[in-house]
Amino acid sequence: MRQQYDTSAPPAAFSVADAFMLRTALDALGGVRGLDTLDVACGHGSTARLLASGGARRTVGVDSCPERIRRARAHETGETGEAGAVEYHVADAAGMPQLGPFDLATAVYLFNQAHDRVALHAMFRAVRANLRPGARLLAIVPNPGAFPHVDWSPYGIRIVERTPGGDAPLLRARLETDPPVAFECREWAHADFAEAAVDAGFATVAWQPTRTPPACEIRDEPYWARYRSAPVSSLMNCVA
């Protein structure tokens, strides 16, 4: 569900809303200046760069795809060839090595990639093992139960098929880009995420209300009001 298409294209509405929701949560915590930060499933590095630009003492990005890490590093070095502010590692989230400890971790559409309950719990345990006591995990996760009742295509994503089975239903979907990008993920309930977090050792789990950016010429307030009535994602806030 991460945006794996051409990053020069304008971001989809759901991605814009996610970024705003995450920035708002970070601001409410007082920012990241002086913190050691970790971004899991970092993709091309946009969230990791956000953390680094906010004054984090150390920022580490982790992703299982070598090509996404290559592109993230290329964005960091740019034309100068100098090392960037983010340290990147190729690693599977469920088997992530000890890279910390960190004061804050972020994860955007990571946990819905878990193919079964064992993998889901392993992901949360790997993140928790890299956090200091009292550290925080901010995770953006998709909301379950939308298909076939809600059409998310105006916001940049379409659920094509839902197949029950396994520990969670399989969703086949696509990003409404040009060309479209197909992907699959599991439709975990929020209770499943919370259970895995508590099992991993997080002391508290909370869910923050969906927040959207201010209206603009492209997306007015009625547009965002419709989005908030059935949002793509929620923000999970866990304290170690």
Predicted stretch roles:
Residues 109-113:
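Short catalytic micro-motifs in class I SAM-dependent methyltransferases
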Residues 196, 200-240:
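C-terminal lobe and adjacent flexible extensions of AdoMet/dcAdoMet transferase-like proteins
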Residues 1-32, 46, 50:
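Conserved class I S-adenosyl-L-methionine
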Residues 106:
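A conserved beta-strand element that flanks and buttresses the S-adenosyl-L-methionine
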Residues 138-198:
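SAM-dependent methyltransferase
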Residues 38, 44-95:
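Class I SAM-dependent methyltransferase SAM/SAH-binding core
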Residues 121-133:
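A short glycine-rich, Lys/Arg-flanked "PGG" loop and its adjoining helix->strand segment in the class I
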